[in-house]
């Protein structure tokens, strides 16, 4: 599923209101965690132990807000979105940022925690 196929994207906020990102060890860039449903976001929190204080939704049809979000996270060395990261299996969809919009989406496989 591409981020553009979702009507809304759900993001995890920490206690300071910052969005959660994932960065692999020794990687230069990080990925912004996003989910296609609130249930998937809650599942990730349960499986990973993430201390998300809040789950917020952003309609993908709100192009101005999507563009503003992408510009904001790029300033924090975040270069792509990780959609529906399955913490146990390490699978997700990586959606590249192209300018201030969503670009190419491709399947991504991380090393799951159990295999480390």
Short names for language-model regions:
Residues 1-116:
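Conserved NAD+-utilizing ADP-ribose enzyme module
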């Amino acid at each position: 599923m591409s981020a553009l196929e979702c009507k809304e994207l759900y993001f995890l906020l920490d206690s300071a209101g910052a969005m959660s990102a994932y960065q692999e060890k020794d990687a230069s860039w990080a990925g912004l965690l996003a989910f296609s449903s609130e249930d998937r976001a809650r599942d990730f929190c349960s499986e990973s132990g993430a201390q998300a204080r809040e789950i917020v939704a952003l309609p993908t049809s709100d192009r101005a807000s999507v563009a503003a979000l992408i510009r904001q996270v790029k300033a924090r060395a975040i270069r792509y979105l990780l959609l529906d990261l399955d913490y146990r299996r390490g699978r997700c969809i990586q959606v590249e940022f192209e300018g201030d919009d969503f670009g190419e989406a491709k399947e991504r496989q991380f090393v799951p925690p159990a295999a480390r």
